[in-house]
Amino acid sequence: MPKLKTKSSAKKRFKISATGKVMMAQAGKRHGMIKRTNSQIRKLRGTTAMSKQDGKIVKSYMPYSLRG
């Protein structure tokens, strides 16, 4: 049976935390920042954990992730 391939789009966008959660960047920070308050923009910094249901799908895209 051939090796499974990792989806390149998934490995660029998601990281697996030490506890196995899928971490992703906050959405909504590409454009349109002028109409948002500074506090709204600050809240979009960093990463957030994905829901368990969606994380399960993303983990299937990365079969060789160490903590998957």
Curated annotation (Swiss-Prot):
MF terms in GO? structural constituent of ribosome
Among Pfam families, the record links this protein to: Ribosomal_L35p (PF01632)
The cysteines covalently paired via disulfide bonds are none
Q: Which InterPro entries match?
A: Ribosomal_bL35, Ribosomal_bL35-like, Ribosomal_bL35_CS, Ribosomal_bL35_sf
Q: Which UniProt keywords apply?
A: Ribonucleoprotein, Ribosomal protein
Gene Ontology CC terms, in alphabetical order = cytosolic large ribosomal subunit
Recorded coiled-coil stretches:
none
Instruction: Indicate whether Ligase appears among the record's keywords.
Output: no
**Single Gene Ontology BP annotation:** translation
Q: Which SUPFAM superfamilies match?
A: L35p-like
Q: Tell me the first and last residues of the signal peptide.
A: none
Q: Which PANTHER family match?
A: 54S RIBOSOMAL PROTEIN BL35M, LARGE RIBOSOMAL SUBUNIT PROTEIN BL35M
Family per record = Belongs to the bacterial ribosomal protein bL35 family.
Name of the protein this chain belongs to: Large ribosomal subunit protein bL35
Q: Which organism is it from?
A: Pelagibacter ubique (strain HTCC1062)
